[in-house]
Amino acid sequence: MYLAELGGGTSLRAAVCSAVLDPRGPLFNDPREILEEELRRPGTYFSLLEELARGERRMESLTGALRVSHSALGPYLNELARMQLVEKRAPLTARRDMRYRLRDGFLRFWFRFVFPFQESLRAGAPLGDHYDAEIAPALADHVAPVFEGLCRRWALREMGGRVTRVGPWWGRSLDSLRATGERSGEEIDVVGSARSKVTLVGECKWTTGRMSPRALTDLEQFKLPALRQAGARFPAAGPEIALFSKSGFKDSLVDLAAGRDDIRLVDVDDVAAGLEVGQRHLEGRGVERQS
């Protein structure tokens, strides 16, 4: 629905400026009007959604930012979850260390780049300047979680029965590295499992530069050991590795992957083609899916 409002044949910058940032545009105030009709005390909800628009948050982070107690914030999160706007999820293979995230991509965009600036935009702030200063530098960071979700869906489609559950994982770094302060926490964008074993791990890069071997080194040297330390089980041969990149791969990484049977390099076109071909098949499999 929202994409249709942006229209075709124009640049993203021009479309966002006219449809979303312009106070006369169809999407400038649409989320506010809809949510104000649905929610009591919308101000508190809006503050919460603004915080979540910047990324997933633990409860402690939310209560600290909003200066409220767990018990006071809980009903607001529950109501947003009931409306399917917010969800709570744990790292795959674990049931603790829960995070909350804003599910709708446009609401994430609106509460991050429009809502905090509505007063100045109404006062006549130049739309192009706002886009260049606030949106363009953060756009890759904003889009990255969407790309990661698509990569997880791709994994379900392409890995067949070798992956029946997929999601992100986060947890503590190796105890030895935490003790020295070298590293504190690790995150893996794509973790796939089947029959209680981790069969796939993947890293996703939505950047303008090509992915380097450093991504693989970090995964194998730091992240996989941390995942094992957290109690994950692996097949005897270890998990397969998928590396996803918006901008392709450096030749050194291509050469490295060519010499190993357990590594697959996946670019944006591969992800798009896999999802387009497999969408109906995926929906009919009935597997558990986490994006």
Summary of predicted features, one role per range:
Residues A81-L92:
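A short, conserved structural fragment
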Residues R67-R82:
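Short amphipathic alpha-helical interaction segments
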